[in-house]
UniProtKB/Swiss-Prot annotation:
Matches recorded under InterPro entries: Azg-like, NCS2
Principal cellular location given in the protein's record: membrane
A single GO cellular-component term on record: plasma membrane
Record organism: Aspergillus versicolor
Name this protein carries in UniProt: Efflux pump notK'
Any GO BP annotation: guanine transport
A Pfam family hit: Xan_ur_permease
Subcellular location field: Cell membrane
Biased composition annotated in UniProt, kind: Low complexity: 555-566
Amino acid sequence: MGHAEWIGRTNTAVARSAVGKWFRLEGSGHPRERKGAYFFTELRAGLATFFAMAYIISVNANITSDTGATCVCPAEDLETHCNNNTEYLLCKQEVNRDIVTATAAIASVASFFLGLLANLPVALAPGMGLNAYFAYTVVGHHGSGLIPYSLAVTAVFVEGWIFLGLTMLGIRQWLARAIPASIKLATGAGIGLYLTLIGLSYSAGLGLVQGAQDSPIQLAGCASDEFDSDGLCPSYAKMRNPTMWIGIFCGGFFTVFLMMYRVKGAVIAGILLVSIISWPRTTPVTYFPHTTEGDSMFDFFKKVVTFHPIQHTLVAQDWNISSNGGQFGLALITFLYVDILDATGTLYSMAKFAGAMDERTQDFEGSAMAYTVDAICISIGSLFGSPPVTAFVESGAGISEGGKTGLTSCMTGICFFIAVFFAPIFASIPPWATGSTLVIVGSMMMHATLEINWRYMGDAIPAFLTISVMPFTYSIADGLIAGIISYILINGGVWVIAKCTGGRIVPPNRDDEHEAWTWKIPGGFFPPWLVRAVHGKKDFWRADDEASQLDLGVMPPNGSMSSGSPEQVAEKAVGKY
């Protein structure tokens, strides 16, 4: 038996098993089996998704540990004192290792169960943008932000359960649709610029820019031990930091070239290249200097494969919010709103990419279960000490490899589970290795600006304010507030003037170029499962049969792949693989 024949027979055998029927693989005999869904193709797609998003393990750990989490640093002169406090820095290292384990663990659980229960080829992990807002606005560098870390993870925990309630009642879909399209598109672009600024800064990036005295920001690029008494980079040392240049060329341009040639795992390849260059202790770019902190990091790195239990960030919630109620509420609302936009937008786009979208209702197969898993995993992740979990657009890498079912996500989840035991490697990835990654991710998120309606000022100005205010205030919440309020004031004012003048005074291009907006949702306000339950359908969690008549990428009951001899089915399976 040749290799191709063995693959075909295995695809056929798995398709006809209970696993194949559960995931609706082609050839399973399921009345709604998915075209082109084969066992080995799904596994390969899951690997592609993992390598496309594995960078989140180290990036999320670097960003989140910048808060100090539960490590205590004296309040006086936070920046100077904390950066030179050996005990505090050693504690931060432990937090970084905790978050590495937490990120891999929650990504494993969330991705596996979303694939198993929702049967979608979409992976979940702590979200980029949300983790930056969590770390640098809500908690702050060294805990200098709005609320302590313990309250921040409490807000994330509560947000997850609120998200679950909104999902079950259908309000989640209404909120996502009620926000004007220009604001939703601008939110993604604004977060992209926000991530870019983080990637260029010192805390979790290349160290190319920093704050200044005479201007909001200035060029930097010098080693941290060359800062002057004001903590600024002197002119004679600018752009002389070798770690910055390694990050730019090996982590930036090298990664871009790989991406241009569609090399799988390009992002993680760039990160690993910079990391490998930075690991030897005898070079000027080493991540393990001969100091107390460097020795501690190197000792952990040498373990290579080990399980690091979560210690500092496990169940760190503090339920006494009396002294920070206002800021706690603001953080909670922002987490909830951004998560609704992020998860909804990503899941919708990935479902459409996979061919599982109902254009009439703007819903997709398994949507209720997908959002339920996402919401529950947000709360579980907060117990590990992680920022909110969300769907990753990198799931498109797996879908482009042929992933069509939840088996793809299950494979990605298994890969993240294996990564839990490689914490020493992921915890030893320096920030300059991931800085260019943040810039690249930010540039990809700017693609959303192409769809913004720039022709009408009532749409363009709120969108522009949303995009620009986010990075300049270092806050996603402030950008959203600026965009929404300006949209209400501008378009509300136009509406009032039109009403008062009987429609005689309106902008000349309003009717032709203003984007359509309505709070009404095609297909009804309530989620399909609730409608089915009210109508007395016993298995209300199952989609109606007429969905199979839509072009959703599923086979009709008499699909050609569910008939024929095993040899014919195997031959077709090999061809698709």
